[in-house]
């Protein structure tokens, strides 16, 4: 039993979205913050690291690498106010808490879509590739991931003067777009199949309607391609 190319492509796109979503979540590069004293740090959903500028030139003889050569990172969690720092702590805390929740829900939804695809390949009755609910379940999961990522990303439309968005945020935007594309491909495939199969499986042709036009017609029905 072959799987449609559109479905396989959509699942592959969703898999890339899942990888990008997790990469954006666990890298401390969601935003950059600059303090008044000139120090800078990168803040992610779960980590915040100080950006240490190494002095130019080679170290002297016998010098040992100190703490300044290592990124000083701290873990962040739910309700952490350390992400705000010089910005409004309440606003930044809400932004990161919302994004953490949306990121986790999107990860679960994308993983559920991948699991649905794998279970369908095993030949389960309710999730077989011939059943429409198989594609609809995957489309719903990918659309949910896209929806919650949009909600989380919208919270960062306004940031403080000491903060600038970094590449992890744009990586998550790419994950959101790919999840939307995967859902759109599956929805298009489901609607296209329904348009092809809107007619009943058996079309009954009355003899009285066709007798005057085709005298030699002996068939009582014609099967549709669906």
Swiss-Prot record:
Keyword Flavoprotein (UniProt): no
Transmembrane segments: 6-26, 104-124, 137-157, 171-191
A GO biological-process term: lymph vessel development
Major place of residence: other
Annotated function: Can influence paracellular permeability. Appears to be involved in cell-cell interactions through adherens.
Record key words, sorted: Cell junction, Cell membrane, Membrane, Transmembrane, Transmembrane helix
Protein name in UniProt: Transmembrane protein 204
Gene3D superfamilies given in the database record: 1.20.140.150
Topology with respect to the bilayer: Multi-pass membrane protein
Coiled coil spans: none
Keyword Transmembrane among UniProt keywords: yes
One GO cellular component term noted in the UniProt record for this chain: plasma membrane
Subcellular location: Cell junction, Adherens junction; Cell membrane
Stretches assigned to the Cytoplasmic side: 1-5, 125-136, 192-226
Superkingdom per UniProt: Eukaryota
Extracellular topology ranges: 27-103, 158-170
